[in-house]
Amino acid sequence: MQSSKKVCVVGAGHWGGNHIRTLYELGSLGGIVDNNKQTLSDFKTKYPSISLFQTVSDAIKLGKYSGYVVATPAETHYKIALEIMNSGCHVLVEKPVTLNRKEVSHMKQTAEIVKVNFMAGHVLLFHPAIQKIKEMIDTNVIGNLQYIYSNRLNLGTVRMEENVFWSLAPHDISVFQYFTKSKPMKITSTGGAFLQDNIHDTTLTILEYEQNIKGHIFVSWLHPFKEHRLIVMGSKGMISFEDSIENKPLKLYSKGYTLKDAIPTKKDGPVDLIDYENSMPLTEELKYFIQHMDGSPLEIANADNAVEVVDILIKASESLMKGVPIE
């Protein structure tokens, strides 16, 4: 995919580096912004034809980029994204998009006023297995959606500026919103802070939606092994996706319980391995962003999705600190 429209990446750290590499492979990398001179020097060696900048303002002044990816620390996203959008450029902002409701709402409003796309970096929505599950839900393969649970666990990177829920759960929240197409009516969260005061290392969050749909998200960066597991339960069957296992199996279980004469009766059935496309989520996300740099509306990971996810993060955090459900 070679595009005449170029993207500039703001923030060349670990995840920003992934964006840079992927955009270069797509033929769409135009520039890199980072305030670290050594980092820029390293990228100049790798990509000698790419323009380098120490400030976003300098990149904008050049006027050659149709879109920007913002992969800086979350607390800087708001200011950077506003500057980009107000220059008339489209922007993809990594998760968490912002750390408060007012900022993300203003970002959405700004995008609408200046008529640019504001996309959230909810990369899991572009995983082919997640899109396959969505297709199976929408085509009634598992019947009425009833319950979703997600475990995202590992002995991972411990943050000092945000808790584990803000760091890891945006992925899962975005998927829950994608599957349910509704906002949770009630959110209850609990967890433990063991390494730093008031920065939780593990959380369990319950989300209650309309039509008696329930879900839970369990995240931790203090876990002995990596586990990324998603279970989706319906009235006719269940789906499991093991993202942390080699070959990443997606399985359909045609079994469960039905009511027979008002008595729960177990229904056995086959377990089928479901095929899905072999594509990289980040590549698909960036291709989608580039395709929509013409200003056409985003159907996935759009501004509405960004606002919903941040709102759920905030309400879950409130429940976590107060020890009560939040409606």
Protein language model regions, located:
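C-terminal helix-rich "cap/oligomerization" subdomain common to oxidoreductases
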Residues: 1, 67-72, 210, 288-327
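Contiguous beta-strand/loop segments that form the cofactor/metal-binding neighborhood of enzyme cores
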Residues: 1, 170-249, 276-297
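N-terminal Rossmann-like dinucleotide-binding module
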Residues: 1-47, 281, 290
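A short helix->loop->beta-strand "cap" motif at the edges of active sites that frequently abuts
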Residues: 29, 50, 87-89, 114-116, ...
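Short, conserved SAM-binding/catalytic segment
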Residues: 42-50, 107-111
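Short acidic low-complexity segments
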Residues: 51-63
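Beta-strand-loop-alpha-helix segment that lines the small-molecule cofactor/substrate pocket
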Residues: 62, 67, 73-74, 78-125
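Predominantly a Rossmann-like dinucleotide-binding segment in NAD(P)-dependent oxidoreductases
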Residues: 117, 124-196, 323
